[in-house]
A protein has these predicted regions:
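The feature captures the beta-strand-to-loop junction immediately N-terminal to the Walker
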Residues: 33-35
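Helix-to-loop junction immediately C-terminal to a conserved catalytic motif
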Residues: 48
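Conserved structural motif at the start of ABC-family nucleotide-binding domains
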Residues: 2-4, 17
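Conserved ABC ATPase signature
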Residues: 132-136
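Conserved ABC transporter NBD signature motif
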Residues: 56-64, 76, 110-115
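ABC-type ATPase nucleotide-binding domains, specifically the catalytic core motifs of the NBD
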Residues: 12, 30, 68, 93-113, ...
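ABC ATPase C-loop
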Residues: 149-150
């Protein structure tokens, strides 16, 4: 469904991604594991069209995403929830959510239906829909960020470090929601440092270091890999 082949990315003279290849099939939940600065966000920003790949191919089904505008990529069904949430803190929860539907702004009925689905997934947001997003807790702000991405009607959802800055219980709840989104039919590509939480819900995973994919496998093989356990699970 989403396939990267030999993707490279440069920031000036610095090589951020070097020959990255990965695949997320229909209905899969695929994790991209890596330490801070390993290249996870660079992968997502390149898929989303924010950064221009220096080489390689990025395909969604039979379409090439290379050269598409970010809004076109969203309209085609590949939607990112960025690291750090990137909300507008002074705007209401509802307005933040509706920004995610911008590329579908001419389809009011479908947007209202989608909003109902998001509120059903995150009932607390319905209660706080008129509150400034910046007044919410970190976990609630992450709900807004995920909900905003869902308003874009993703077929492939890119989640960049959703556990960042959250308490352990909130991380558990967040990952349960991510699993529910996937089980409802959305393909998920999840970038995380929290290997223990991420691998528990993953079908497959890749490990990225210094802009290169250095390992891949199913959940069980990576959970039991000694190097992965030492580096990311602390065991």
């Amino acid at each position: 469904m989403l396939t990267l082949e030999n993707v490279s990315l440069n920031y000036g003279s610095f090589t951020a991604l070097n020959g990255v290849s990965l695949h997320a099939g229909q209905g899969e939940l695929v994790v991209l594991l890596g330490a801070n600065g390993a290249g996870k966000s660079s992968v997502f920003l390149t898929i989303s069209g924010i950064h221009k790949a220096a080489g390689g191919s990025i395909r969604y089904g039979d379409k090439s995403l290379v050269g598409m505008k970010p809004s076109q990529i969203v309209a085609n069904g590949v939607v990112q929830c960025p690291e750090g949430r990137k909300l507008f803190p002074g705007m209401s929860v509802l307005k933040n959510l509706m920004l995610g539907a911008y590329v579908h702004r001419g389809d009011g009925a479908a947007n209202r239906q989608r909003l109902e689905e998001v509120m059903a997934l995150f009932p607390i947001l319905d209660q706080k829909k008129d509150d400034p997003a910046g007044s919410l807790s970190g976990g609630q702000q992450q709900m807004v960020a995920i909900g905003r991405a869902l308003m874009g009607r993703p077929k492939v959802l890119l989640l960049d470090e959703p556990s960042l800055g959250l308490a352990p219980l909130v991380i558990k709840q967040t990952f349960e929601v991510i699993q529910r989104i996937n089980q409802a039919g959305t393909t998920v590509l999840l970038a995380e440092q929290n290997a223990f939480a991420a691998l528990k819900i993953a079908h497959r995973a890749y490990v990225i270091e210094s802009g290169r994919i250095v390992m891949e496998g199913d959940r069980e093989s990576l959970m039991n890999n000694e190097a992965v356990r030492r580096a990311y699970i602390g065991a």
